[in-house]
Amino acid sequence: MKKIAYLECPTGIAGDMCLGALIDGGVPLEYLKNQLNRLGIAAEYDLRAETVIRQGQRATKVFVDLKTKATHHDHDHSQDQTHHHHADHAPHRHLPEIQAMIKGAGLPERVERWSLAIFQNLAIAEATVHGTTPEQVHFHEVGATDALVDIVGTCLGLDWLEIDELYCAPMPTGGGTVKAAHGILPVPVPAVLQLWQQRQVPVYSNGIEKELVTPTGAAIATTLATDFCQPPAMTLAKIALGSGTIDLPLPNLLRLWIGHQPETPHLETIVTLETQIDDLNPQAIAYACEKLQAAGALDVFTQGITMKKNRLGTLLTVICPVALVEICEEILFTETSTLGIRRHTQTRSILQRRFETVATPAGEIQLKIGYRGDKIYNVQPEYEDVKAIAQQTGQSWQAIAQQALCQFPRDAES
């Protein structure tokens, strides 16, 4: 069975509401604090949770108490509340520093990957709004401690719950105005609009003239959600409620549906990016490919082609998840000479994957196993494991790989 989750956000979404729903769903508060402290921010905040009642419904409200002079942006939908982008948030951090903190924290692999993608997408949105690059944006909000807690904490919670796939409901627009570091802004604020545009998020008005979706909440949903839709088919196991701060005409709650789906042929929406280049040093193309792979592209490859005027060129193709399209396009525009990129949205069928370690006479090797339901279709030894042992022993790569495959239990393939 596959474990899925659905974010239902009738009154919007913010980072603290995500944390509240996850803790309400069973994620231990102390686990979150211990993992978050690996970012080196233990002296900057305290995290606590309380049970609250919102229009007769019990829910969990999370508070991020900053120990420096700053005001956390609770999701209170109030036009009098200062927006995420505070002028007095401390400390302010730029994107490269945030990335270094996350990469150096030793977080679970999915948590690191998700967190980096969320911050990158938010940086791209802010940079587009302010007419600069993601690395040059001075983040009042993204670099603040509370945003680190909200974003990385949400990723930790989803990983702890072992959520395989996340879906999200269409989002309410809200309305009115909000105070920000750049002055008074209309709601939805520009960064939220940009994030919605990047993912083509379906939105609607529920008639509430407050700020309902914050940049952090929008970045989390637009990066991690597979689709924005009505609730997917599932066997519902739990409903968890994360609370906002003030009362609204609707209960101020983010509802997290947690359930299971039977294992079926897995279909995944991907985007193929293509660009043709005939005026760039091959070394620069190689570097761009490395950056794309590091950013999370599913595959990157090049093909030699003949272009107009019979010039030899390169067709650079990138296959990536929908959530990473903007990131990969940013790399292509920054690192290559291309003036345009083609997008093709496709659906692919993929096998599920798991890893097992087997002991061979030469040492332990990890096997990647491709399966669907109870049937195993493919077993391959991990290249780097085989390479390391081959170099140590002087045996051929193929001989070591065959030893590993021989140790895989044959009855597991039936």
Swiss-Prot record:
Location of region: Disordered: 70-91
Note whether NADP occurs among the keywords. Answer: no
Q: Which InterPro entries match?
A: Ni_insertion
Q: What keywords sit in the KW lines?
A: Nickel
GO terms of molecular function: lyase activity; nickel cation binding
Q: Does this entry carry the keyword Ubl conjugation?
A: no
Q: Which domain of life does this protein belong to?
A: Bacteria
| Family, similarity comment | Belongs to the LarC family.
Q: What is this protein called?
A: Putative nickel insertion protein
> What is the phylogenetic placement of the source species in the record?
Bacteria, Bacillati, Cyanobacteriota, Cyanophyceae, Oscillatoriophycideae
